[in-house]
Amino acid sequence: MAVLVALFCLVTWALCTRIPQYSTQGTQQLQQPEKTPHPHPRPEDPFPPTHAADFKIHDPSIIHVDGTYYSYSVGKHIRIHQAPSLDGPWKRTGTVLDADSVIPKGDRKAPWAPQTVHHGDTYYCFYAVSNSGCRDSAIGVATSKSPGPGGWTDHGLLVQSGTGKGSDEHPFASSNTIDPSVFVGEDGHGYLMFGSFWSGIWQVPLDETLLSVAGDTRSEARQLVYMEKAPLPASKHPNPLCREPSGARPIEGSFLSYHEPWYYLWFSYGKCCKFDTKNLPPPGREYSIRVGRSKSPRGPFVDKQGRDLANGGGEIVYASNRDVYAPGGQAVLTEKSGDILYYHYCRYPAVQETEVDADLTVNKSTSYDFWV
């Protein structure tokens, strides 16, 4: 999720018994600047502190199989780490791909923002290839019968934007096909969420193999997250695939989870990385984690005040606090003990460093108190 950079961001672990309870001064539409806490240490920060773990990662995807945790992250051929617990120790054990992605575009050597799901007897690793700041992108998928390294088959292209077959069709003609996330319901129906900047976050249904889009995307595509008014100026890049004429909308990194009776759509909003410590964005413009919910996996998703995420809504769940800066790239891991929200963040004030400690923060939940 987010534009790939050399900066190592952090995954966090909050020692909580449920997703944290706090007040966020009310839900605010994305068009308005949020009064997100400044990252300097403040005792009144309403978010839980972090618990350190020695693990460097960006855009994490974690699954739990037979007592072992597997993490998939950006890096050459998609890195795999394993650990006996979320606390670690995490050990790099190999990669998903044995070679560069078979998709002939973008950064084929180090695909971005992988997400791995287990469905039936197969593990699916969805990934993106792109070039930073442009929407000439594609989403691919690899499969294996086991979650560890070795035995993965790269099936290549699933969807693409910018150039190539199908990129001129709706919704790919206006979107950026990165940050893939796949949800498979109890009925076996699969859905692909994707999108970064441009026209926001979209969803298309997948067929039963999870290797192809089902139906006609022109009628089946759903725009899940968007904001009409762009908060950032338009790019002046000479390549039309690298500029947004109406301005930039920093929405990306979606993830869909289910906690009966609601489907929760999580996403990241704001600037993810490449921070200048002497000129940080205004408070609330850096990454934060937002959410909306719906009774249907297809939406529409709304925040606490009933605002549609496709019209600027979004409940702030976690934002900068203490030494945590720009948390995002979030996902939810469902365990017997409850749902676990995990994410990466940049450590303040060393937000530019390439060598930093990592904190694995998990918000364990038996109830979604942030919605009360």
UniProtKB/Swiss-Prot annotation:
InterPro entries attached to this UniProt entry: GH43_arabinanases (IPR050727), Glyco_hydro_43 (IPR006710), Glyco_hydro_43_endo_a_Ara-ase (IPR016840), Glyco_hydro_beta-prop_sf (IPR023296)
Record keywords: Carbohydrate metabolism, Glycoprotein, Glycosidase, Hydrolase, Polysaccharide degradation, Secreted, Signal, Xylan degradation
Bilayer-crossing regions: none
Ranges of Basic and acidic residues composition bias in the record: 35-45
Region span, Disordered: 26-52
Family named by the database record: Belongs to the glycosyl hydrolase 43 family.
EC number: 3.2.1.99
Record pathway: Glycan metabolism; L-arabinan degradation
Location, primary (coarse class): secreted
SUPFAM superfamilies, sorted: Arabinanase/levansucrase/invertase (SSF75005)
Reaction catalyzed: Endohydrolysis of (1->5)-alpha-arabinofuranosidic linkages in (1->5)-arabinans
Pfam families to which the protein is assigned, alphabetical: Glyco_hydro_43
Class in the EC hierarchy, top level: hydrolase
Annotated source species: Neosartorya fischeri (strain ATCC 1020 / DSM 3700 / CBS 544.65 / FGSC A1164 / JCM 1740 / NRRL 181 / WB 181) (Aspergillus fischerianus)
This protein's name: Probable arabinan endo-1,5-alpha-L-arabinosidase B
Signal peptide, first to last residue: 1-16
Active site, per annotation: D59 (proton acceptor), E252 (proton donor)
Carbohydrate-modified residues: N363
Site (Important for catalytic activity, responsible for pKa modulation of the active site Glu and correct orientation of both the proton donor and substrate): D179
GO cellular component, as recorded: extracellular region
GO biological process terms on file: arabinan catabolic process; xylan catabolic process
Record GO terms (molecular function): arabinan endo-1,5-alpha-L-arabinosidase activity
CDD domains the record matches: GH43_AnAbnA-like (cd18831)
Subcellular location(s) per record: Secreted
Role summary: Endo-1,5-alpha-L-arabinanase involved in degradation of pectin. Its preferred substrate is linear 1,5-alpha-L-arabinan.
